[in-house]
């Protein structure tokens, strides 16, 4: 591909973003996250990619939305890495699977099921989608320090949102329903759409990536008749992601 002054999709060049980047899916969430940075400013917006840059503890940091799913998320990571980013935290939403995962919880993923296809263009299916240990540790410590109810474990990643939520009407319903039962028996915490791709792409780029999510709903709790309310306030997950970045910055400085 022809070399461009700015990255083709995110419209950023070297110096526009920090080494540390938070990756929400929703462009509308970027400004909210940037408000927790110091000296934050708008950088660019193109397609699903909205970017702000600021500082934390004096270190340049950024937030870049990815849109929905692995394809657009992998593009964001590739292009951010091209201009100097190497540490990523996905902060997003998920739906609970295991019964003790409740609306409003924060889920930290230590691995992801590759029930999607972007990662298959980076690594064979036998290769696991595993979160970076340093980033995961920072997320867990941040959640505990902030007093958030937190779940740590494997998440399932898919390409089709309605394949999960309306599997019975799909021509491949037998596969979707059987695999969903397998995820339940394996005590998978939640379902979302980006982490499997991001973890594998990060490994291919020799970067660090972890994920934390706000639980919106748990359809298995609903089926079981357990109490829950839909929760769309992502503040807790955002706070955990930002606090984790601070801890990573401090740890990286101490290791120098």
Regions found by a protein language model. Name each.
Residues 40-45, 147-154, 250-256:
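Flexible, glycine/charged-enriched surface loops at secondary-structure junctions
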Residues 219-256:
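His/Asp/Glu-rich mid-to-C-terminal helical/loop segments that flank catalytic regions of hydrolases
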């Amino acid at each position: 591909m022809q070399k461009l002054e700015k990255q083709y999709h995110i419209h950023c060049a070297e110096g526009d973003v920090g080494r540390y980047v938070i990756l929400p899916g929703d462009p509308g969430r970027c400004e909210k996250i940037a408000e927790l940075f110091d000296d934050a400013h708008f950088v660019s917006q193109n397609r699903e990619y909205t970017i702000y840059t600021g500082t934390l503890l004096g270190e340049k940091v950024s937030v870049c939305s990815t849109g929905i799913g692995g394809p657009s998320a992998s593009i964001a990571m590739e292009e951010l890495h091209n201009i100097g980013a190497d540490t990523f935290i996905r902060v997003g939403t998920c739906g609970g699977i295991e019964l003790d995962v409740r609306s409003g919880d924060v889920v930290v993923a230590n691995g992801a099921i590759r029930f999607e296809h972007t990662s298959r263009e980076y690594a064979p299916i036998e290769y696991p989608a595993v979160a970076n240990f340093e980033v995961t540790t920072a997320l867990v410590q941040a959640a505990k320090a902030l007093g958030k109810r937190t779940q740590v474990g494997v998440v399932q990643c898919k390409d089709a949102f309605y394949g999960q939520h309306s599997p019975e009407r799909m021509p491949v319903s037998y596969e979707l329903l059987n695999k969903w039962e397998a995820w339940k028996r394996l005590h998978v915490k939640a379902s979302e759409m980006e982490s499997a791709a991001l973890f594998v792409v990060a490994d291919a780029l020799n970067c660090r990536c972890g994920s934390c999510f706000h639980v919106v709903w748990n359809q298995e709790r609903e089926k079981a008749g357990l109490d829950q309310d839909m929760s769309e306030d992502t503040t807790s997950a955002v706070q955990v992601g930002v606090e984790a970045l601070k801890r990573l910055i401090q740890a990286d400085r101490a290791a120098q």
